[in-house]
Amino acid sequence: NNTATVISAAPPASSAVTLPSMSPSPSASASEASSASETSTTQTTSTPLSSPLGTGQVMVTASGLQTAAAALQGA
């Protein structure tokens, strides 16, 4: 759980740096969505070996959500 929280703390920070002037609300929503997905994956994965893979997938999905948020902002 601690490792997942540390990993989850990194993507929102990068999204905030990537989209500072556009609008902070979409980045916050993206971070909330990523945190929700992380909690679901953490609950689903009970094996310690599968949890690192799950966190990696969460990282990818979080970046995807950030990209989608950026696309929505651009539109």
UniProtKB/Swiss-Prot annotation:
Question: Does the keyword Oxidoreductase belong to this entry?
Answer: no
Query: Cellular component GO terms, alphabetically?
Result: nucleus
What main location does UniProt list?
nucleus
GO MF annotations for this entry?
A: DNA binding
Q: Superkingdom, according to UniProt?
A: Eukaryota
| Disordered as annotated region, ranges | 1-56
Which key words tag this protein in UniProt?
Answer: Activator, DNA-binding, Homeobox, Nucleus, Transcription, Transcription regulation
What segments bear the compositional bias annotation Low complexity?
1-52
Q: Which family does it belong to?
A: Belongs to the POU transcription factor family. Class-2 subfamily.
Q: How does it assemble?
A: Interacts with POU2AF1; the interaction increases POU2F1 transactivation activity. Interacts with NR3C1, AR, PGR and HCFC1.
Provide the function of this protein.
Answer: Transcription factor that binds to the octamer motif (5'-ATTTGCAT-3') and activates the promoters of the genes for some small nuclear RNAs (snRNA) and of genes such as those for histone H2B and immunoglobulins. Modulates transcription transactivation by NR3C1, AR and PGR.
- The protein's name is POU domain, class 2, transcription factor 1
Organism encoding this protein: Notamacropus eugenii (Tammar wallaby)
